[in-house]
Amino acid sequence: NYMITILQARTRGMTLMRMPLTVWGIFTATVLAMLAFPALLVSAIMMTLDKVLQTSFFMPTILKAGEVLEYGGGSPILFQHLFWFFGHPEVYIVALPAFGIVSDLISVHARKNIFGYRMMVWAIVGIGGLSFFVWAHHMYVSGMNPWFGFFFATTTLIIAVPTAMKVYNWILTLWRGNIRINTVMLWCLGFIVTFVNGGITGIFLGNVSVDVPLSDTYFVIAHFHMVMGIAPLMVIMGAVYHWFPLVAGKMLHEGLGKWHFWITFLGAYSIYFPMHYLGFIGCLLYTSDA
């Protein structure tokens, strides 16, 4: 519905290169969902067959009454590939609409056209396309061939280029704009700061030699929650404060909105930012109680 509406039901004169960036983000995320979710569906079906019919897609061996049965060919690594082929585009299914929304909010509340509109569009499309070539950076410690690790580390760093372009364009849109530091703008600025912090930690985890000692530590928890938790939440709240008056015909309280932002921002950083240090000193996510 999203794809056909955007492609076929635009108003007269609304060309693709005139659409709001929010719509571009939703459109690209919809394409990613159409291509990525089948991998998750297939892996779920294969896992169900392994459990119910004792097939061997993911299970290399099976025990029955303490006896190893003839059961071969399965690989748990195959499940990881299928899951993460869905899992990493899913990050951008969440992030790309947020990128579009924050671009439009910054433009409105800086009272200035978004800097480099076409560049922003192609950055959204480029991020979406590259998201299908980076999934195995979640699997550096799975025993993959080092050349594959090198390939996925390279693509992971490449996808940072269009992402950085978007951040630069947001900053250049703010530059010399007639900025109103209201609640919506605070949420947008909080998103930029949080997303940049999360992106920097992502560079650590995208590098094979650094990721191996940091894998399964609290550093990963901090990175994930900054990028996939706090940053999108800030965009959602900014969008609510921006569009609620249009929907309800009432303005939300500006003073309470700023309190809401600062409690959320400082609270999130007080919880997740120290986890980077915990990861660096080797605090693991999982510890055996045996």
Question: Model regions: which residues?
Answer:
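Short amphipathic alpha-helical coupling elements at transmembrane boundaries
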Residues: 5-11, 173-176
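Hydrophobic cores of alpha-helical transmembrane segments in multi-pass integral membrane proteins
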Residues: 1-5, 22-73, 79-108, 117-140, ...
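Membrane-interface helix-loop-helix junctions at boundaries between adjacent transmembrane segments
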Residues: 7-25
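Generic hydrophobic alpha-helical segments
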Residues: 13-15, 178, 273
